[in-house]
């Protein structure tokens, strides 16, 4: 892969790959990035202990920036999580405890570190400055620079009010807090670029404008398109729920399958965004038709899984998919999982089997499934999944919950 340097027009590369929706000053930002290493930040409120594939576009964008020599900052909204961003939401978020927020911060940082190299000062919590600022001080320092009339014109707020949904003053003030975050990161860390989804445009330009009004540095904003699949589903969701980026919430095998099963129309676009393949290869794979397009889907699944979970997990998931699905199915229509007699003789347990095929993320996950009655062999609940498989298992149906069923097949 050809890795750009900060002397090149990085914006053109990002546009070609589909990362750019809007820039506050496209030419100015391109020149700024070409002039030398810049510091960019991506912010998340700590509302969950992981990120999902809906966040992946931002992580990949930050990865490209770091490869080009720029410095990434991960801003966790330890303070703003208590409020909640009202952007394009119909209701308020639940209030979390401090312990929940800290656990979520730790989980998000672990996911983020798989995509960019984090240093000791790469992780920032906005509680660092927001917890210490008084209300009157904040109004004087920040509030004087904002017009209520203008805030009411922003889509995120206007649409909420147009639908006659309640918007608390707490949430209304969120955009001022995010603007203040940008200015504080500029002052404290020399940060000049904020990244975000298209729904963050108003919050980002408020930060750019606040810095200008306060006589601070010139700041830039770049937003990414809000992604949806070609069949209209919001990116980050599947029929089974959120597609999480950590193995504790979603097994690498299921993560791999999400990409392998994507709509044919999405393959080229997803390869550009979620792999690091050169664009010539992306275009070649995206142009494949019919059965050949499955090759491109496997490439996509391998690339996305390797970034999220490592090369070993990607290979294991791909091998499991070949073993489970490539052979076709028996009369029942269920996919087949193969296991060797030699491995069975060594004391193979169901836990071992599910981990080796990357179908469950951990031993504890298998045990929880069994404890809840969700792990069954031919309809009989398995109480001890760690026990060696005994008796004749060839042809038995292995069930994981209500929706996932496999046939076991012994091979020499």
From Swiss-Prot:
L-tyrosine binds at residues 41, 174, 178. GO terms for cellular component: cytosol. It catalyses: tRNA(Tyr) + L-tyrosine + ATP = L-tyrosyl-tRNA(Tyr) + AMP + diphosphate + H(+). Keywords: Aminoacyl-tRNA synthetase, ATP-binding, Cytoplasm, Ligase, Nucleotide-binding, Protein biosynthesis, RNA-binding. CDD domains: TyrRS_core. Belongs to the class-I aminoacyl-tRNA synthetase family. TyrS type 1 subfamily. NCBIfam families: tyrS. Homodimer. This is Tyrosine--tRNA ligase.
């Amino acid at each position: 892969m050809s890795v750009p340097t900060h002397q090149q027009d990085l914006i053109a590369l990002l546009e070609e790959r589909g990362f750019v929706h809007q820039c506050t000053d496209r030419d100015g930002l391109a020149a700024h990035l070409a002039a030398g290493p810049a510091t960019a930040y991506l912010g998340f409120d700590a509302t969950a202990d992981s990120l999902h594939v809906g966040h992946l576009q931002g992580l990949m964008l930050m990865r490209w920036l770091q490869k080009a020599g720029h410095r990434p900052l991960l801003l966790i909204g330890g303070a703003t999580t208590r409020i909640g961003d009202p952007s394009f939401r119909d209701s308020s978020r639940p209030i979390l405890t401090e312990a929940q927020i800290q656990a979520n911060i730790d989980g998000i940082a672990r996911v983020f570190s798989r995509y960019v190299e984090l240093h000791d000062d790469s992780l920032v919590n906005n509680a660092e400055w927001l917890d210490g600022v008084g209300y009157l001080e904040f109004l004087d320092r920040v509030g004087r620079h904002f017009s209520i009339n203008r805030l009411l014109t922003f889509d995120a707020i206007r649409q909420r009010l147009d639908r006659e949904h309640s918007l608390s003053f707490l949430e209304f003030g969120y955009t001022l807090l995010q603007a203040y975050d940008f200015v504080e990161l500029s002052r404290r860390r020399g940060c000049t670029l904020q990244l975000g989804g298209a729904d963050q445009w108003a919050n980002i330009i408020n930060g750019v404008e606040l810095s200008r009004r306060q006589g601070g540095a010139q700041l830039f904003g770049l937003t990414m398109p809000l992604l949806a699949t070609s069949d209209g589903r919001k990116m980050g969701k599947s029929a089974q729920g959120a597609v999480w980026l950590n193995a504790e919430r979603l097994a690498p095998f299921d993560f791999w399958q999400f990409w392998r099963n994507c709509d044919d129309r999405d393959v080229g676009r997803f390869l550009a965004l979620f792999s690091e393949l050169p664009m010539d290869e992306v275009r070649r794979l995206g142009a494949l038709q019919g059965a050949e397009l499955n090759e491109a889907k496997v490439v996509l699944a391998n690339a996305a899984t390797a970034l999220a979970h490592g090369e070993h997990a990607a290979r294991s998931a791909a091998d499991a998919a070949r073993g489970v699905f490539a052979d076709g199915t028996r009369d029942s229509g269920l996919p087949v999982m193969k296991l060797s007699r030699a491995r069975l003789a060594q004391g193979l347990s169901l836990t071992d089997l599910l981990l080796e095929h990357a179908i469950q993320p951990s031993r504890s996950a298998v045990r929880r499934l069994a404890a809840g009655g969700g792990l069954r062999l031919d309809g009989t609940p398995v109480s001890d999944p760690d026990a060696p498989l005994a008796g004749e298992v060839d042809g038995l149906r292995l069930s994981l919950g209500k929706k996932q069923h496999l046939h076991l097949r012994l091979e020499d």
